[in-house]
């Protein structure tokens, strides 16, 4: 069995609950498709849990891909990791990650540093620029979590089997079998709208909530979306609705399942009126 999860977004309780339904014995594998952070209240703990899981089982059994939210965070880290660097055009863009996080109560940052450090950053925010605050915050993170940041930076962008492509957002399908050469990082991490239709391999992705426009177009739909051709989407918007999706692929019978309460529910083509 190949399991897949995506877009956990700091929801640790839901992740731990879903993991009770994953069996990693034998040749079974688990693939995480990215976006482990932001929105939820436990970004660091989710990353730590997945990192430890991979260390315990190995990176051939637990495959961890990078999502666009990890990349945005890492872009911010990389722009400000030198405390003496002048703000570049890129850093002026990426300090917006911190500004956005502060607008949401520093929901992600506070999971990486102490409350005392958060209060210090809030205090200097009254008089300092976002560039200066970013440099301070990045040094705080690196002082305690440099190894985790290194791990995050080296996460792959896709995982390929003989019949499937697991990726955070999607690939350039116009490139056909040369997709791995023709797909940009921006597409792998942020493709929108979600692709549908026939492709020579099955694409399993997250990034786009399954109930959103272009997929189910139904705000009450939070199950796995299958287009009936070559695409499975597994982002159930857990941070909004509390439902983390778990896909299971049985390599023996070539069937896909949505795993709920340890039940394997066959995934069928989405029909708007069913």
What feature does the model see in each segment?
Residues 1-274:
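Feature recognizes metal-dependent phosphohydrolase scaffolds
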